[in-house]
């Protein structure tokens, strides 16, 4: 299980998704309602309920996909779903950051994009495994 490269990519996606709860994507200044007051905020995955749900879904999907190593079809489907969810995380992260008056993106803002890339590379690994199995079946 662990020797397959897509398992490592899925594990990277899981770790990156968990890290989005701990580290902020960006720090910025937000206006308080319709006043002239401003406050400093840090945006991470725990800031928005929808972002929390998407991130938890991404963690669960990548973890389940790791243990479905014997069923490549389901693993591929979970990778596609995880990829779409992680694209939603990226879009929501960008929209939350752009709502700030002034913002400074952190290095951790790359984590959602790392999740997307990890899911994509895991999908490619699963697909190459399927091709390898089909070619070996033809040799029999």
Report the location of each language-model feature.
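Membrane-interface extramembranous regions at the lipid-water interface
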Residues: 1-2, 6, 43, 72-75, ...
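Interfacial loop at the N-terminal end of multi-pass membrane proteins
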Residues: 2-3, 8, 14-57
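Lipid-exposed faces of alpha-helical membrane segments in multi-pass integral membrane proteins
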Residues: 8-19, 53-63, 81-88, 110-117
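Structural signal for membrane-spanning alpha-helices in multi-pass inner-membrane proteins
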Residues: 20-24, 65, 90-97, 119
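The feature represents the first ordered module of a protein
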Residues: 39-93
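Hydrophobic alpha-helical transmembrane segments of integral membrane proteins
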Residues: 83-110
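Alpha-helical membrane-associated segments of multi-pass integral membrane proteins
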Residues: 104-128
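Cytosolic juxtamembrane helix at the C-terminal end of the final transmembrane segment
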Residues: 122-140
